[in-house]
From Swiss-Prot:
UniProt protein name: Glutamate-1-semialdehyde 2,1-aminomutase
CDD domains in the cross-refs: OAT_like (cd00610)
Key word Isomerase present: yes
Subunit record text: Homodimer.
Gene that this sequence comes from: hemL
Gene Ontology biological-process entries: protoporphyrinogen IX biosynthetic process
InterPro entries tied to this protein: 4pyrrol_synth_GluAld_NH2Trfase, Aminotrans_3, Aminotrans_3_PPA_site, PyrdxlP-dep_Trfase, PyrdxlP-dep_Trfase_major, PyrdxlP-dep_Trfase_small
PANTHER family named among the record's database cross-references: GLUTAMATE-1-SEMIALDEHYDE 2,1-AMINOMUTASE, GLUTAMATE-1-SEMIALDEHYDE 2,1-AMINOMUTASE 1, CHLOROPLASTIC-RELATED
């Protein structure tokens, strides 16, 4: 029996099915973000009603241990009382003013204190806004036009960054979506992630043309893929030598893999940092920041324009402050590391002896399981993993009350609300699936 058949037998799904019928009439594909549509795994999506701690509950009353965690923001789990209380208090005072507030000052101070590269920060409303604005700022600051990104790194849906690699080692101007014009994409170069030598060769030839290199210091949008030893350090050296800015997109890793993000974990300080997800505590938010001399080029201090009606709104700032204050507690990240290590160890043990090829990647509380026989270090090796095996595994886990992202290219997330019990139940469910596929 396939995992999908198991799920259909075990799970009540009538209400979710009826909601999907209504949704497809009024929303493209029935969803407001493509991955939610379950296209990668087949079947229809589940509609969620509520969350509590490490669990979510769908419209039919099924409960799941959640490893999506809204794709990363919910570091404390679902509906933590301190965050809910902060948002309620803020809402009673007013949801938005279109004017500065104390809350945004306090969150800016906290971010600057925690993140090594950030001396000055601008709040926005999404990770896409943050990366678009950081790229514009890099171009305005350097007077150069070209940007280098890496294949499989996702930086939101801005036209200049919605670009993937084609044939050849370095490609320029290949849009990844209809509607992105060649003109919008032609100043973006793409190279394989973790290939420092390719970067070195490109910059030896044309480095003076590049305003910035932007990357996820830990890739999370092709599954969790860590930087190889020396990769981040090499990028720092190469960009500094030619006057290009190094931009870390830490929308996913900021306050997730350590309090100071991946830059603190790996000891490499970029020029600009993009943030989001965790810093909003589950509400829409983004931010970009960096050295004072660069950030002072942003309007109204400087000529590089960026603005937003709801930027720094009290609800998001309140949720962010309540979340980030918890991250400063003794043992916070040590606990997340313990839980992540338990998940990784358990998954390796569950898969041992199976005929199924498995690679497990983890950085802190970011995790991924690939159905691949060798190391997964870039987009090519991630894309070579077995999508059909993932689909069957996904539905089996769902039928056992474990909610994974419905795509093999999404990292999983462990929250502080997870416990050893949830991790062990997850491993047991995985072991059951692997047991049916012994060598």
């Amino acid at each position: 029996m396939s995992g999908l058949q198991e799920a259909r037998l075990r799970l009540a799904r009538d209400r979710s099915a009826r909601l999907m019928e209504r949704a497809v009439r009024r929303m493209p594909g029935g969803v407001n973000s493509p991955v939610r549509a379950f296209r990668s795994v087949g079947g229809d999506p589940l509609f969620m009603e509520r969350g509590e701690g490490p669990r979510i509950f769908d419209a039919d009353g099924n409960a799941y241990i959640d490893y999506v965690m809204s794709y990363g923001p919910l570091l404390l789990g679902h509906a933590p009382p301190e965050v809910v209380g902060a948002v309620e208090r803020a809402a009673r005072r007013g949801t938005t003013f279109g004017a500065p507030t104390r809350l945004e000052v306090e969150l800016a101070e906290l971010v600057c204190e925690a993140v090594p590269s950030v001396e000055v920060v601008r709040m926005v409303n999404s990770g896409t806004e943050a990366t678009m604005s950081a790229v514009r700022l890099a171009r305005g600051y350097t007077g150069r036009e070209k940007i280098l990104k890496f294949d499989g790194n996702y930086h939101g849906h801005g036209d200049a960054l919605l670009v993937s690699a084609g044939s050849g080692v370095a490609t320029l101007g290949l849009p990844d979506s209809p509607g992105v014009t060649p003109g919008a994409a032609r100043d973006t170069a793409v190279l394989p992630y973790n290939d420092l030598e390719a970067v070195r060769e490109l910059f030896e030839e044309r480095g003076e043309e590049f305003a910035a290199v932007i990357l996820e210091p830990v890739a999370g949008n092709m599954g969790c893929i860590p930087p190889e030893e020396g990769f981040l350090e090499g990028l720092r050296e190469i960009t500094a030598a030619c006057g290009a800015l190094l931009i870390f997109d830490e929308v996913m890793t900021g306050f997730r893999v350590s309090r100071g993000g991946a830059q603190e974990r790996y000891g490499v300080v970029p020029d600009l940092t993009c943030l989001g997800k965790v810093i909003g505590g589950g509400l829409p938010v983004g931010a970009y920041g960096g050295r004072r001399e660069i950030m002072e080029r942003v309007a109204p201090a400087g000529p590089v324009y960026q603005a937003g009606t709801l930027s720094g709104n009290p609800l998001a700032m309140s949720a962010g402050l309540a979340t980030l204050r918890r991250t400063g507690e003794p043992g916070f990240y040590e606990r997340l590391e313990e839980l992540g290590a338990r998940w990784e160890r358990g998954m390796r043990e569950a898969a041992s002896g199976s005929a199924v090829p498995v690679t497990v990647n983890r950085v802190g509380s970011m995790v991924s399981l690939f159905f691949a026989s060798g190391p997964v270090r870039d987009f090519a090796s991630a894309a070579a993993s077995d999508a059909e095996l993932f689909k069957d595994f996904f539905w089996h886990m769902l039928s056992r009350g474990v909610y994974l992202a419905p795509s093999q290219y999404e990292a999983g997330f462990i929250s502080l609300a997870h416990s050893e019990e949830e991790i062990d139940r997850t491993v047991e469910a995985a072991a059951e699936w692997f047991a049916g596929r012994r060598a």
